[in-house]
């Protein structure tokens, strides 16, 4: 791709770009013709470009901007598209609606960066003539945002989705509950947010922290994301990482008589759910309300970092293990996840969970492996669908360098830009059957030390640009080409007001990642 021309410095990199002579100019009289099924993409085009360019882009059967949905188009899959820009007309085609939405983002990037910001005067809204054929390498290209440790307003989640969509990412993994906070309202259990949504402080700072979304806000977020081709996958942690839930409803724990606070520390809490039937009823009821809010085919239920000490010491848990024919109380973890997974499958959803080894979740689970790349292969060999999330390449809560002026971040070696871009969701040497089970990859941003949107964006960008580029383009990657395109792409980030970490010679160096393995 001719990245030396700024208008062709597209990110992520399209599959095939063939420049043509000439320019196509959008003007006040430029109209949009949306063929049947393409109306949503046309609406998005107007929503994104109208306020910033001042162009109406009115619908018309004679419009020179044509959006066409053709299910018979071969080789494009669910998200591929073809874009032809000529001097007199623009044609965007796809086999599925999401493909048109991806093409709309490419049109945005072909325009001057001012088309993303608004307020510019005297700009000619021109696109270079070009032919683009583009299909993603992986169907899962995600970003996980932890709003349990530090709550973020729903208005910022809308912006987060907008930035994801610009980079053709398609799954927002929303981490809604943890030991330190519960952010989703559950009508059947109102104390989850009235009590579990508040903690006295973070570590020893003495500053209370609170927050919860309304169901209307979450429905609005899902709708906003869907209009941009992004699925919101909720995560409700269980059977560990549940201290906030136990603060609200102590009877769900292994010591019902004990009164707990919402946890104020970070790390792994040894307080976990009990395994009595009331706990399973609670989980099923919560998940029913989750499924009512989130149409995502995947529902994440956490599952990792669950100490079994309380079960080993609990007569009730030992009795449950014996009654279920388990060898030891520690085996209750797999039993618990199996019960929850079966419930989600019965409701037409795909249970998803974190895996510490790749082999501990029931077979119906889609597995996110984070500790070691080899665990992804273990899970694939067991027949799981896999989303690779190796912490040394996808955890954006680690610093981007060892520079002393970096913002506070998770303890551990840095995860530099190069480590993110060179991470292949399907490492070389995997067999075809193993590789076919990898859905893709995603970034993670745990927010123990990330308190504000400014810090979120500093830690996220430009590293999320790197992950988006590799997840969409696949292959062995082109670091030098990515760096060249990224230099131009920062003008778009500037136009959008993204508070990204500035590019430096050091950050663009091809250095290897560290090897430490701190907890998530």
Q: Model regions: which residues?
A:
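Flexible, acidic glycine-rich loops studded with aromatic residues
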Residues: 351-365, 370-520
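Generic recognition of stable, solvent-exposed alpha-helical segments in well-folded globular domains
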Residues: 44, 99, 156-159, 213-220, ...
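Flexible loop/turn segments at secondary-structure boundaries
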Residues: 40-41, 151-153, 179-185, 239-245, ...
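Short glycine/serine/threonine/alanine-rich loop segments
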Residues: 55, 169, 228-230, 349, ...
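Active-site neighborhood of glycoside hydrolase catalytic domains
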Residues: 245-251, 255, 260-364, 370-382
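Contiguous, structured surface segment used for ligand recognition
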Residues: 2-138, 455, 467, 471-497, ...
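Feature activates predominantly on carbohydrate-active enzymes
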Residues: 76-270, 275-280, 284, 288-298, ...
